[in-house]
């Protein structure tokens, strides 16, 4: 939102004009329906210049149908882009094949580079000679003539022209190490394991911590992430019947690293690259102890 707001300001347009489409989640539901997204694009598309979504929604963990959204946007003449921060390294991405116009992402989530790690960007090759950067840097200059120092910019085509300067070596090293591990397998294999791993977590949560009318005082958990594996990545977003901060603190005290998001969600993401099914089982056992302590 901040980036879009800044871009709109630089173009001399107000936020109200730029972010004019508001989404409403249906009563009793926690996520957006794909058909509703496509219907809005079809209805409003003639007034929309750019459609921009998250690949995976950070709060709910919902994986959007990027291919369908891209096709719908293109039918109305819109540019379509995605923030893939929670998608890269998590789900299979075929940005080029889907015809996505542009995308960006960070590397400190599923790519394991650490907080503040390098970002990444994608521009479809069909735009390589038409989309130009607003901010120029010498690293975007053609390598063959970069050091001639003639003060005439010879911009590299595509996303390479958006580079500004040297990569910081201390940030490159952890990312390179992580990508070398990724190269030992494939996203297809990781995704297959991920579906099973998160499915196992979902099964155990529903088995042990679903609301039980016969035990009205027992804490329970509601999963707000879609149950369909095709509409989620690793992450399950959990909503609790008791104050979430206490649960988070009890888990943290027991050595479990989760993520709390206000107002009421705990994000849990068993990651196939380094988590196991036994990790998931231990988490469920620890979660039970944390719930017991939190509600006592």
Report residues per predicted region.
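Pyridoxal 5′-phosphate
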Residues: 1-296
């Amino acid at each position: 939102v901040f980036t879009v707001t800044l871009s709109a300001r630089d173009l001399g347009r107000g936020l109200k004009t730029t972010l004019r489409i508001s989404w409403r989640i249906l009563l009793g539901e926690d996520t957006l329906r794909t058909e509703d997204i496509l219907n809005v694009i079809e209805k409003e598309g003639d007034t929309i210049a750019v459609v921009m979504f998250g690949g995976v929604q950070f709060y709910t963990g919902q994986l959007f149908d990027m291919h369908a959204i891209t096709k719908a946007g293109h039918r109305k003449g819109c540019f379509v882009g995605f923030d893939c921060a929670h998608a890269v390294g998590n789900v299979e991405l075929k940005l080029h094949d889907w015809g996505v116009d542009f995308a960006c992402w960070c590397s400190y989530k599923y790519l394991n580079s650490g907080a503040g790690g390098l970002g990444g960007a994608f521009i479809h090759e069909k735009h390589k000679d038409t989309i130009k950067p607003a901010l120029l840097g010498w690293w975007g200059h053609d390598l063959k003539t970069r050091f001639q120092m003639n003060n005439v910019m010879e911009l590299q085509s595509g996303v390479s022209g958006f580079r500004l300067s040297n990569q910081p070596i201390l940030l490159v090293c952890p990312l390179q190490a992580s990508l070398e591990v990724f190269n030992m397998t494939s996203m297809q294999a990781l995704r297959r394991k991920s579906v099973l791993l998160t499915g196992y977590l979902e099964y155990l949560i529903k088995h042990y911590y679903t609301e039980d009318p016969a035990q009205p005082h027992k804490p329970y958990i509601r999963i707000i992430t879609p149950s369909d594996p095709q509409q989620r990545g690793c992450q399950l977003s959990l909503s609790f019947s008791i104050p979430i901060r206490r649960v988070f603190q009890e888990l943290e005290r027991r050595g479990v690293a989760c993520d709390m998001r206000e107002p009421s969600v705990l994000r849990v993401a068993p990651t196939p690259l380094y988590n196991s099914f036994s990790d998931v089982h231990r988490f469920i056992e620890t979660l039970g102890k944390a719930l017991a302590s939190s509600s006592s």
